[in-house]
Amino acid sequence: MPTGPAVAKPLSGEERIARLPHRVRGALRRAAPALVLYATARLVGLAVAAAVASRAHRPLWITLGDSWDSKWYTGIAQHGYGTTIAGRTPGFTYNDMAFFPLYPALQRTLATLIPLHMTVTGLVAAWLSAFAAAWGIYAVGESLHGRRTGIVLALLWGILPHAVVETMAYSESLMTALSAWSLYAVLTRRWLWAGALALLAGLTRPNAVAVAMAVLCAAGLALRRSRRDRRDWRIWASAALAPLGWLGYLSWVGSRSGGPLGYFKIQQGWGSRFDFGVSELRFLKGVFTDRDTPPHLAYYMGAAVVFAGLAALVLLVLDRPPLPVLVYSIVLVAIAIGGSKFYACKPRFLLPAFPLMLPAAIALARARPRTTAVLLPAIAVVSAAYGAYSLFYADTAP
């Protein structure tokens, strides 16, 4: 006669691995609506871009895969680091060590596996990363506010004004994918995954330090709140792993460029430095008040996205998300706004800051179906049109 409830036997490592494919299929099945909607939004954007490319007599795949930053990534993938070019502005020097290594490494790896041009493998890497990012964004949204919010959150990421970047041979999609899944691992207390993914994210872009700080924040909170957690080696390991990618690359650059601050000196050669937003404010003032500044849609859009990002951050704070999610968002906004130069690219720098859209996703998930059926397609059309403009008519990098 039983004396109490049966206690489930903990799964062994082998049993967990055996069950992994089943769990992945189940998670993919739940995320399918979000991924289908995201893919549809990006296909619409690509279709509009293809139509404009045809009229402009410019190959779409070259524009997406071999322009602006894509050229630098392809060069690193083909030849490694070591390219330095004198800038058009006196005193500027463009050094390819400004670009982090993981995306070109993935690009090169794909080129060794499939017999395609390096430009094409760059696009394949970006598209796979974008799909993984949309899935991770859905997972975070579902974990925090339910399935419907997760679906809307993933779709919103695909119809942002600069969402065309998600289908270019850029590193933002890879960073977003790794960051989203690292945050999801934090939220579900998968500590080793959180640290390992943050480590990889730190090898994608300089602003990926945000996810390392989020993991460190989560680990610190866990260690502070629970005596039991202080004995969990996985939490300590995640905190140790999270910043290693970012710090490791900066250390490597420093060893090749004359000191621990070598990476930041290289960034200064590109005209980029952190000045707490002074240059940003000066530039925005010039855009709206200086008659000598020519009107430029990319600058106006950049300003609009910056203001929207700040407003979204306030709403996110009021929504009181888990502290690691908030830390991640604040750091990304601070880096994007506090850095000088590349003003038209500020929206691109904010692409990984998907938690900023959580308040909007929650509101749309609760709205009437008719409202979302009208509003979201309208936003998608604007996104597709602006994406085509930024690719073929703007004279600044998307």
Task: Please give the residue ranges for each predicted region.
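Hydrophobic, aromatic-rich transmembrane alpha-helices
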Residues: 289-290, 297-326, 332-336, 354-360, ...
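Membrane-interface alpha helices of multi-pass inner-membrane proteins
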Residues: 158, 179-184, 192-217, 241-244, ...
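Short acidic/glycine- and proline-prone juxtamembrane loop motifs at membrane-interface regions
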Residues: 168-174, 346-347
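Loop-to-helix entry region of an early transmembrane alpha helix in multi-pass inner-membrane enzymes
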Residues: 91-92, 101, 105, 113-132, ...
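Transmembrane-helix signature of polytopic, membrane-embedded enzymes
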Residues: 117-121, 137-159, 193, 323, ...
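Short hydrophobic/aromatic helix or loop-helix immediately within or flanking a transmembrane segment
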Residues: 68-82, 90-115, 277-284
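Transmembrane-helix motifs of polytopic, lipid-linked glycan transferases
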Residues: 109, 121-144, 311-314
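Membrane-lumen/periplasm interface segments of specific transmembrane helices
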Residues: 41-57, 212-309, 324-329
